[in-house]
């Protein structure tokens, strides 16, 4: 029973890398058709469906943010799982960090 529980927990919270995007995309249409707001708590993901709410936890400091998937991107080729809005990223790390290791959970 314990092994099964560990497998289930591991499948719902895996280590990933997140970056952020902002300024040049602010006000432009996202892949979902809504306008990008760099201050909203949203993110781009090629794995999760539009509208999925994710809890993103910075592994280095434990800070977290809940964001909603509303965009896609070409960031996967750089080893990045999520591209957070500027507002969401600022909740978990200074923008100057640029890229952070995170845990991701659906909520």
Model-found features: residue ranges?
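Secreted/periplasmic proteins
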Residues: 13-107
């Amino acid at each position: 029973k314990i092994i099964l529980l560990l497998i289930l927990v591991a499948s719902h919270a895996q280590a990933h890398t997140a970056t952020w995007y902002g300024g040049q995309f602010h006000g432009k249409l996202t892949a979902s058709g809504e306008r990008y707001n760099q201050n909203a708590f949203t993110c781009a993901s090629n794995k999760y469906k539009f509208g999925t709410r994710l809890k993103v936890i910075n592994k280095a400091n434990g800070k977290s943010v809940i964001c909603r998937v509303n965009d896609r991107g070409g960031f996967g080729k750089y080893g990045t799982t999520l591209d957070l809005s500027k507002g969401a990223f600022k909740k978990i790390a200074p923008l100057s960090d640029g890229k952070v290791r995170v845990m991701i959970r659906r909520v």
